[in-house]
Amino acid sequence: PLLVLDCRDNAVKMTVARKNKYFYDQKDSEAIEAIVKSYPFDTDIAETDVQHEAIVQYDCTDWDFIISRMEANGLICIADNGKIIAKKPDLSGETVLDAVFGATMLAFDAELDAKNQYQNLKATTWDYSNQSVITVDANEPGFEENGNISSSDLGNVLDIAEYDLVAGADVTEKELQ
């Protein structure tokens, strides 16, 4: 006989039912707080910047919606013992684990993929109210913790000088950035 025990956080309840919801005049963080409030969880949600006219959760689980909105804001989201935490990664803290190959780490398999790293990124949308095109050049993320290969070196691999993202929705310049 084999006993298989699958242990999960109570947040697994958020991963089952697909739902549809509308959030008006709210920030992403406020919409997430409203969703989590319907469950018996505590929260630690970092406040997001953009106030949306409307946010639509369409045919997706609460957890998938939370993850997608937090990812769009550059935040990570975890469930930890009945608490939903969403915040920017803090890389200034102390090292939690010193991995030494052969001692604390017996095997390591990693891949590096430059397919989605571009030299320059430009986002464009249509402003319905002013009947004009809005174009924003992306800022460098300033994230230098990805090893000894710079983002510009990775962007040069496929030799794509500029990549255009086009949004069909009416989004603000801040959201395009």
PLM regions: where:
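Amphipathic alpha-helical and helix-coil boundary elements used as assembly
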Residues: P1-Q177
